[in-house]
Amino acid sequence: MATVRRQGRIRTSIGIVVAVLVAAACGSDSESVETSFVGDIRAAVDAVEAELGAGQEYFEVTAAPKLTNIFVAVDGATAAIPYVYADGELLPPAPALTGASGFTFTAEAIDVDDKAILTKVAEELPGATIQTLSVEGGEGGSVRYVVAAQSVGGGVLDITVGPDGSVLAVEPV
């Protein structure tokens, strides 16, 4: 499973972007599960498609409470154009990331229960602080949902979940 994940990620710069997202999301001390940002995944993809046209391919979409990062596959999935969606607005794209590789998906592949996905993680891993939800490209245009959370012990976990939030795998980062 870890091999597929590594293949589905853009190796250059994504780690930095995700680290910034995780750091930005760590400030919450709320006992309730913040799920409002899950809907930003669809809103961000819709905004990209309104800007570029329907049928775009994506490497990854990662939502956090403050913003959503979208990595649009271009040039035959050999490069990615990073966008940020924040406060209901798609910001201008960053420069292309060349040398990208991995699986891609289209908007139609995203099928997630916005209300349940993070709630189930919180129920199954009590005490973990949810930081981000990512939709990653999988084999054959499928998607994989990964929740990043800080464990009670302070470590960061990548939690692979089903569209309904059922925990499928937990990996320390």
Question: What is the role of each PLM region?
Answer:
Residues E34-D46, V173:
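Cationic-aromatic interfacial patches
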Residues D87-T132:
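Long, charged/polar, surface-exposed segments that mediate recognition or autoinhibition
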Residues D46-P82, V135-T160:
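Exposed beta-strand-loop-beta-strand "reactive/processing" segments of non-cytosolic proteins
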Residues V22-A25:
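C-terminal motif of bacterial Sec signal peptides marking the signal peptidase cleavage site
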Residues A79-T98, G155-V173:
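A short, surface-exposed beta-strand/turn
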Residues T3-I14:
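Bacterial N-terminal signal peptides that target proteins for export
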Residues G27-S30:
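Bacterial signal peptide processing site
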